Amino acid sequence: MSKRILYWLQNDLRIDDNPILSELATGQCALDIVFVINPDWFKNNNYQQKPYGVHKQQFLMQSLFELQQALIEHGQTLHVLEGEPVSVLKQRIAEQHIDEMVCSEHVGTYEQRQLARLKAHCPHVIFKTTQQDTLFQQSDLPFDLNELPKSFTPFRKKVEAASIPITTSTLPKRLLPQPITLCAANPIELNEHTNYNNAVMHGGLKSAQTHLKQYFSGLLPSTYKITRNELDGFNNTTKFSS
């Protein structure tokens, strides 16, 4: 019987430059691809602010919709679940008889705590994380972590001097491993959240690639040091963190 793997999506809502998907595409397994929407994202926090406002929610839904369609083309299914992530994933692991869970490696305190709790609840499951949310992986750096510069400029100078080649993973032109469950849980539909007409910034891989091409095809990078601290102006920031 083939291994049953759950891929927990977080900030990696793309099929290109996704080492996890590229590796899964070459293996033999049954695959469950899951994204969990946390209701706390849309609630006021201690400062009466919501982590996700209307525009960020629209950006997220656009990204999920585009990924959903891309996965369908590769023979897979995106399952969008809702609830507290650890509880939702613990239940999903039990229901789908998951042997292994894969996800991006995060440096955030809350994300690391969630993963630690999930490991404690599911000791029989193998957990694997991959660095794919950063420009460089730890193995690329020309120094050990205990020698990591304390500020950006010394870091940049060391990295520039090392001339580290950047390679992107490419999803093979084949179907992904078969889905554990074919019918999507809560499929993303075309609605006001996925409508592109009124959005200043659009979510999804295609929009990101278009933005990168537009940004680097002109003179904007050459003026970045001048404009990076501006509080207004669409072209004054890279928007690479979006």
Regions found by a protein language model. Name each.
Residues 1-167:
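Trp/Phe/Arg-rich N-terminal binding region typifying the photolyase-homology
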Residues 164-242:
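Catalytic cores of enzymes that engage adenine nucleotides and/or redox cofactors via long glycine-rich
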